[in-house]
Amino acid sequence: MFGFAGTDYEKVRGDFRKVTDPYSGNEIFVVPAIRPDWAVIHAIRADGNGNVVCSALEADRLAVLAARQAIVTVEEVVPAEDLVARPGEIFLSALHIDLVVAAPLGAHPAGCVHSYGIDRAHMEEYLAASKTAEGFSEYLSRFVLGKTEEEYRELACGKAV
């Protein structure tokens, strides 16, 4: 990893190692791979088998590939034939996905490429609320706890889907 030279990471993180890059000869830091139990990502669409079409966010792909199991929430579950007809759009193979869940507006208040943008007003409300434990608790009570997906969408987005 670049950018750690001259920092205290080497002292405070015993699992960071400085090694010689075999390609450049420069000293670099390496870190152990993360192996989470689960990865959960949101995508544009997938078929029921788990073949996923989403924006080319490499972080999403890496999270799924690193995890022992993966869930993908999607704007739309489509028939497998729709994806087979356009194999170049498949970003993640069903081999890596354990569960597909239809969740329209599931990325809200963040955006979902080709579907909807960031809800800046709601994101600002969330960020302001999350600055304190009390504010975050109030946010959860208002928008999340005890709410159905439809109730959340109505409260947060002003529409039901």
Residue ranges of model-derived segments:
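Conserved alpha/beta enzyme-core scaffold
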Residues: M1-V161
